[in-house]
Amino acid sequence: MLYYALVFLIVAIIAGVLGFGGIAGASAGIAQVLFFLFLIFLVISLVAGLIRRT
C-alpha cells in the first residue's frame, strides 16, 4: 500500500511540474489538434462503412 502511495505522489509531482509549466499550453494545443483529426477520421470511417453496405 505504501508503494502505491509513493507512486501516486511521484505522478502528482510530475503532473504539477508539467501543469504549472509552459508545457501544459502546448500539450493542450496538440491534444485539440489530435481530437479534431481523429474526429474527422471517425466521420470518414462511418461514411465509408455506409457506402460499402449499400
Swiss-Prot record:
Topology term for the membrane: Multi-pass membrane protein
Places the protein is found: Cell membrane
Primary localization: membrane
Gene Ontology, cellular component aspect: plasma membrane
One matching Pfam family: DUF1328
Transmembrane segments: 5-25, 30-50
Keyword terms: Cell membrane, Membrane, Transmembrane, Transmembrane helix
Family: Belongs to the UPF0391 family.
Designated name of the protein: UPF0391 membrane protein R00741
Organism placement in taxonomy: Bacteria, Pseudomonadati, Pseudomonadota, Alphaproteobacteria, Hyphomicrobiales
